[in-house]
Structures are given as C-alpha cells and as structure tokens.
Amino acid sequence: MAEAIIPAAELSIKTLQNIVEGITGVDRKIAIGFKNLTDYTLENLGVYFNSGSSDRSIAYKINAQEALLFSARKSDHTARGTVGTFSYYIQDEDKTVHVMWSVPFDYNLYSNWWNIAVVDGRQPPDSNVHDNLYNGSGGMPYPNKPDQYINNEQKGFHLFGSMTNNGQATIEVELKKA
C-alpha cells in the first residue's frame, strides 16, 4: 500500500484495517490515519524508526481537510516490532505535531503503546523526541495504551485519537484548532 493522502471525511477504521491487512509476510504492522481538520497545510519533517520500517515514503504535506495514510512493519528476520515517530510542521503556527507508535514483537514483555503531542517550533523526529514521547518525559504527555482515547488540548490544538490492541494495529488521529 502506497502512503496516500485522501479527503479527511473518507478516513475510517475500515480503511486502516484494509491497509494493515495488505501488508503481507509479517505479523507486527500498523496503519495510521492522521486527519488534518485545521485550515493549515502540514509539512513533513520526517520519520524516525526505532525498529521496523515502511515500504513507502511518507507524504510531503497534508493540506487542510485531508488525511494521511501511513503504514509501517517490523523488519524481516528480526525479533523486534515496529516502533517509531513521524512529525509534521504547522508553519503558520510555528508548531510541530508528533505521532509515536509502538507495536512490539513480544507481547509477553510489552504491549502496544502510542502518543501524540504538539510542541512549539520546528522539531524533526529523532531518537530524543521519540524517547520523550515513548516515556512521557521532556515535557511530552504520558503515552497511551491501546483502546484508550486521547482527547485533549495542547498548544492551541485539539487532539483526538485511539489505537487498537493487536499485532496488526491501527491508529486514527484527528488534529483540530482549539
């Protein structure tokens, strides 16, 4: 599945389930839908992978009222899942929105984990940003377990989202101006 941009109104959990089911050959994978329900264009700052990869590059921008479709998977022949962070810059507001996911290889030791945050300035994803999102440190909100909704305001934006709890995970996130 190529990463794509679709109208935000067309994003559904079924769309994400179809994407994740289309990733073959691995048991740990994720499809993420990110709705930009603001009046701003979001500029991609990159993707950081702690483990795993994506078969496609992430979209350069997400226009107002559009949704990003992104997928990632564990790397072949490794005992690790897919764990990473992608970030988009909200130029008109000089803020960055980060989305972090973790779909572990070993559910005896770990569980799915995710987070979203809006921060001041232009902040590309890297190991420090990812670790702060994963651990709820460095001023980042505490991460969420699957099946727990995020519904809060950060830096003038309303964030809403959820993650499913299995090795074929989905995350659906909405960003709105507060």
From Swiss-Prot:
Disulphides: none
List of residues binding phosphocholine: 51, 83, 102, 104, 134
Inhibition and activation profile: Inhibited by sphingomyelin.
Statement: the UniProt record of this protein carries the keyword Cell cycle: no
Pfam families registered for this protein in UniProt: Anemone_cytotox
Record GO cellular component, one term: pore complex
GO molecular function: channel activity
Function description: Actinoporin-related protein having hemolytic activity in vitro. Binds probably a phosphocholine derivative with the unique amido or hydroxyl groups found in sphingomyelin. Involved in drought tolerance.
The protein's name: Bryoporin
Provenance organism: Physcomitrium patens (Spreading-leaved earth moss)
